[in-house]
Amino acid sequence: MSARPILWDVDTQVDFIRPGGKLVVPGAEEAVPAMTQLVRFAHATGIVHVASADDHELTDPEISDTPDFVHTYPPHCLRGTPGAQKIDETAQA
């Protein structure tokens, strides 16, 4: 068996990327065109697109109304909310 490349897509979700998201990563929106190109290339060439998604409920220990941003964070990527969805540009086939 030979090694094959994969596209490893980590948590490209609305709450981390889009303006107004609950825990936006600085500069993430500017990286979306590059993400789009990577996903399109992977789909076109048969590269496997592996994706993770952050997933929380309000009762998770990481979620806090008074976050320390080390061990706790404000509510984000709450299961079933628009912010938990992958952005369209990184949607899997």
Report the location of each language-model feature.
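Active-site acidic carboxylates
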Residues: 1-93
